[in-house]
Structure formats: C-alpha cells, structure tokens
Amino acid sequence: MSKILIIDDDEELCELVSEYLSVEGFTTEAVHDGETGLQKALSDDYELAILDVMLPRKNGFDVLRELRKSSKLPVLMLTAKGDDMERIVGLEIGADDYLPKPFNPRELVARLRAVLRRVNDVDEKKPAAEAFTVDDIEVSLTGRTAKLDGTELNLTAVEFDLLVALLEQAGRIVKKEDLSQRVLDRRLSPFDRSLDMHVSNLRKKLGLREDESERIKTIRSVGYIYTVV
C-alpha cells in the first residue's frame, strides 16, 4: 500500500483527497505548510508527494527546490488552472507531473498510479540486461542510476526513464508519441508541453559533448534522437 504525502493549506481539500485515495487503496498524511511539508518529504516515509504551489511559510517551488537537492521522491504538483508558468516552472525544477486545480479525483489517482509505475520500473519494454553503457553514460536499471564519465547524475524518475528510452534507441529517432506513452504513461496531447520540459531538464543535466554538440537533438514535429559518436 503506497503512502502519499499531501502538502496543501486547503484542509478541506486535503480531507476530501485523503478520503478518495483511501478508497483507492492508498494511505495518506496531510500537512498544511511548506516548512513542515519539506521536513516530512525528506523523511523517506512516503512513496510520493502531492505538492501545492501556494503554501504558507515556504511556497511549493521552494519546497521542491530544497527537496531535489537530496531526494528523488516523486512529486505531483497542483497548479492554478490555466497558469502555464506555474506548470512550466514546476517541471523545470523537478516535478514528475502536474495537475491543475480544480481537478477530477479520478484523474489524480490515474496520474499518481502512472508516476508510481514509472518509479517502480514496471515497464514491459525495459531491456533484459540490468545495466548498459552508451558512450560515456553508464546506466543501472536495477539501481535506477545513471553516471556520466563516472559521476552519478541527479535525475528525477521521469528524467531517468526518458534517458533510458532514448539511450535504448541511440542514433535513431524516438517519436514524441511513443516517449509520452512510455515515460509519462499517457497519450501525447497537442497542448501538453510536459515531455518537452523534461527533455530540456535532461539536456541541462547531461550538458554538451566535448565538441560542443548536443547529446539529445530535436527532430521537429517528430521526436528526439540521442546522438552517438
């Protein structure tokens, strides 16, 4: 049974979400300010955190920034409906997914389960090998870690799965539709930029090659390719 941390100052919403998630087989704990939420999130007692942006004492973005310095705990951010900037910033600083308020509880559950499936590596398409290497990147599938020139990369669950998906097809184009289905566990929609933001974050963490070329190239209107040397 997965334990979910809810960080939101709307106590009524927390109660409703907790009741719904309980029926769906989750256990929950709710806190109502950013400082307490960060302390709880760093305790390693939870499988996932639901994090609101607008919080007293420490806002959701600051909580996520601090959390990502030392934790890979999956985070689903609650953003204001129609506020693209909140969504983009959240994804840029390490959120695994987002959901605008107000939301359908069924969609919340679907997104939680999708994130947890990715984290637990329940993916029929993963290769049989437990580890593999492409150029200067070493990947451990069992440990869910990736090293660049021997130094471990600080990747979120989504970024790790995205890197694996691209490296498995290194030198070949991977369609955005296929990446979205595999990495985000949902069909690609016309206005959803989540995948693009995760690719952008991954690019920043990988950096350029020694010849200043990009490791991940965008094939306009098609997808992405991890280049090989």
Regions found by a protein language model. Give the residues of each.
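DNA-binding patch around the recognition helix
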Residues: 124, 129-131, 154, 197-199, ...
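Basic, amphipathic DNA-recognition helix from helix-turn-helix-like DNA-binding domains
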Residues: 59, 65, 69-70, 74-132
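Charged docking surfaces used in two-component/phosphorelay signaling
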Residues: 12-23
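Short hydrophobic/Thr-rich beta-strand motif most characteristic of the beta2 strand and flanking loop
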Residues: 25-33, 40
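Active-site beta3 strand of CheY-like receiver
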Residues: 45-50, 55
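His-Asp phosphorelay/catalytic-motif detector in bacterial-type signaling
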Residues: 45-47, 70-75, 189
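Short, Lys/Arg-enriched segments at the junction into DNA-binding effector domains
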Residues: 3, 114-173, 177
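Conserved sequence signature across two-component system core domains
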Residues: 7-8, 31, 49, 99
